Amino acid sequence: SRIGCKDVSLDLWPGEVLGIVGESGSGKSTLLNMLSGRLEPSAGHVHYTAADGKVLDIHSLDEAQRRRLLRTELGFVHQHPRDGLRMSVSAGTNIGERLMANGARHYGNLRATALDWLERVEIPVQRVDDTPSQYSGGMQQRLQIARNLVTTPRLVFMDEPTGGLDVSVQARLLDLLRHLVRDMGLAVVLVTHDLAVARLLSHRLIVMYHGEVAETGLTDQVLDDPQHPYSQLLVSSILQC
C-alpha cells in the first residue's frame, strides 16, 4: 500500500509561516490534513500549545473538543471556497455564524463585525447580503478568509489559497494575505505548488517528495540554493517557465 506521508518532524512558532511545497502526490496535502486534525495518522502525534498554555495532542481530542478548538483557535482555508463557505446564505451570515458559534448573539454587533471584515478583505460592504454564489472566485476566497479570521485564531491552515485564480486576482489576494498574517501575528501552515507564493508568504519551507521531507530550511535559502536533487529540479523547472 502507498504511504502518503512518513518520517516527518517539524515545529511551528507563533507568527511564523511554514510553507509546504512539492508536486502533486508528494504528500503535502496529506501532511496538512494530519496537522490540522482532518486526517488520522497511522502513527505519530501532533501537539498544539493552546492559548491557556496546555499542550494538546490533536488526535487524542474527542470530536467536541476538536470542534471547539477549530471554532476558537484554528482556521482552515480551503483551495475551493465552496468547501469552506455556506453558499446559500449571505456573506454577512457566513462571517457572523462563526462568532455565534463562540457565543455572540447581539445582531447589531454581529452585523458591524461582518461589515468591518468585508472591508478588511476588500469586498464592497454593500454586498453583505449577497450570497457567495453571487461572488466571483476571488471574492469567494476573500470571504472564506474573513470567515476564518473573524474569531482571531492563533493558527491557520491554508491549502492552495490562490489556486485556480487569475494572475491579477492572485496578486491582490497574496498582498491581502501577507498583510493580514503580519498584522494579526498568525502562525500559518501553507500548502502550495507555486514557489512564488511560498517565497512571498513563508518564512520556512518544507519540500515534500514521495511522502517524505526532501529538504527544509529558510525559504530564501531553499529556493536560492537547493541541496536535494528534487528541490533543484523543482526550482529549475520554475526558472525555465
Where are these regions (language model features)?
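Conserved ABC ATPase "signature" region
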Residues: 109-126, 235
